[in-house]
């Protein structure tokens, strides 16, 4: 493969004609193909997707929910995953060999997942083992690459979601004295703190300097947090909360645990995407909410609950930019290529990586 092909793979190039089609025509074609293919086609859509995509999704949920739903669907030959790359990887690992997982736009990545690559992680593990010996177990947020999941699998660790992080961190401490949590330092910190681990027992590993950030006696360290974060949830601040408290004293503040510790501590509630959705759903009419999570989801919640006053915690918030790469034109392009008997943007994880990553996934699924 030439350098040019590596830099600009043809699969990522949306044909020009899709830019000139009307929304009405694109929606009509998507409906036609869905009807024609029937059960042979399954379209999972993440909560953070645009409405123009979600309207055609056969299931809407978080990344692991969608991968599990895809895996339970044995009728579908084609799974067109409307999410980001690591989600499609998980779907590929959990589905059968004769099912094809397609990502409509290969540029739909995740900045947080990319903050922990396998070379950095192997190097960190080697250095940390010099310091702590065989006292550590790795856990990775499902928002990570297949290679990182595989690393955890072969080192006795597991995956976690924002819904089950407490259960999995508790389990980890029944296995080893110390936890290495990848790639989101905030979810790791917030979860460990909720379980009673003091902040001064937590250190941060910086993969760019290959160094441990900690001021005390390293023998006191219980949790080692990878220095990664969600670019969306990083944008919610304590100042946002102070502004809401000042201008809307009766407004409830609910945030995702990917927000930093200070924001979570200052909020009224914190929990997974499902937790946020369920909390708003069960709230009484007339209640007021400021939500600290991705903007497409916040806007959808606002539309679904006109009886409640709901705003984004950060009034200048934007959607997840990489998630937003999946749009109606790319969805239609993926479907029309399938209709022609072609396959583009196929997600296929190496068999050895899959085997080890599934170990990590199954250790979680067996316990939640």
From Swiss-Prot:
Note on cofactor: Binds 1 [4Fe-4S] cluster per subunit.
Primary site of residence: cytoplasm
Annotated pathway: Cofactor biosynthesis; NAD(+) biosynthesis; quinolinate from iminoaspartate: step 1/1
Its EC number(s): 2.5.1.72
Biological processes per GO annotation: 'de novo' NAD biosynthetic process from L-aspartate
Positions in coiled-coil regions: none
Keyword annotations of the record: 4Fe-4S, Cytoplasm, Iron, Iron-sulfur, Metal-binding, Pyridine nucleotide biosynthesis, Transferase
Protein residues bound to iminosuccinate: 46, 63, 141-143, 162, 256-258, 273
SUPFAM superfamilies the UniProt entry points to: NadA-like
Cofactor entry: [4Fe-4S] cluster
UniProt: [4Fe-4S] cluster binding residues: 110, 230, 320
Reaction(s) catalysed by this chain's protein: iminosuccinate + dihydroxyacetone phosphate = quinolinate + phosphate + 2 H2O + H(+)
MF terms (GO), sorted A to Z: 4 iron, 4 sulfur cluster binding; metal ion binding; quinolinate synthetase A activity
Metal-binding is among the record's keywords: yes
GO CC annotations, alphabetized: cytosol
Top enzyme class: transferase
Compartments in which it is found: Cytoplasm
Family: Belongs to the quinolinate synthase family. Type 3 subfamily.
Function noted in UniProt: Catalyzes the condensation of iminoaspartate with dihydroxyacetone phosphate to form quinolinate.
Protein name: Quinolinate synthase
Lineage: Bacteria, Bacillati, Bacillota, Bacilli, Bacillales
């Amino acid at each position: 493969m030439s350098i040019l092909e590596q830099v600009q793979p043809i699969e990522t190039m949306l044909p020009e004609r899709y830019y000139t089609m009307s929304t009405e025509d694109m929606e009509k074609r998507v409906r036609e193909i869905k009807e024609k293919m029937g059960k042979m086609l399954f379209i999972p859509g993440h909560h953070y997707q645009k409405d123009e995509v979600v309207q055609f999704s056969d299931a809407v949920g978080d990344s692991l929910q969608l991968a599990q739903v895809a895996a339970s669907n044995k009728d579908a030959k084609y799974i067109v995953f409307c999410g980001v790359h690591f989600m499609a990887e998980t779907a590929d690992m959990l589905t059968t060999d004769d099912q094809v997982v397609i990502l409509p736009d290969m540029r739909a990545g995740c900045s947080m997942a990319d903050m922990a690559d396998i070379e950095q992680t192997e190097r960190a593990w080697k250095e940390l083992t010099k310091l702590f010996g065989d006292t550590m177990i790795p856990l990775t947020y499902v928002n990570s690459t297949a290679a990182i999941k595989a690393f955890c699998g072969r080192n006795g660790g597991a995956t976690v979601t924002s819904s089950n992080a407490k259960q999995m961190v508790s389990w980890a401490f029944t296995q080893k004295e110390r936890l290495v949590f990848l790639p989101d330092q905030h979810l790791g910190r917030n979860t460990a703190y909720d379980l009673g681990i003091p902040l001064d027992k937590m250190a941060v590993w910086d993969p760019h300097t290959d160094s441990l950030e900690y001021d005390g006696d390293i023998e006191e360290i219980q949790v080692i947090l990878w220095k990664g974060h969600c670019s969306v949830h990083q944008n919610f601040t304590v100042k946002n909360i102070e502004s809401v408290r000042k201008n809307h004293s009766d407004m409830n503040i609910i945030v995702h645990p990917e927000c930093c510790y200070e924001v979570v501590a200052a909020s009224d509630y914190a929990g997974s995407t499902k937790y946020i959705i369920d909390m708003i759903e069960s709230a009484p009419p007339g209640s007021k909410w400021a939500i600290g999570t991705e903007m497409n989801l916040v806007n959808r919640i606002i539309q679904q609950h006109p009886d409640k006053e709901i705003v984004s915690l950060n009034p200048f918030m934007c959607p997840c930019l990489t998630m937003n790469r999946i749009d109606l034109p790319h969805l239609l392009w993926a479907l029309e290529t399938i209709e022609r008997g072609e396959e583009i943007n196929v997600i296929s994880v190496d068999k050895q990586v899959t085997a080890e990553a599934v170990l990590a996934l199954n250790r979680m699924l067996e316990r939640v």
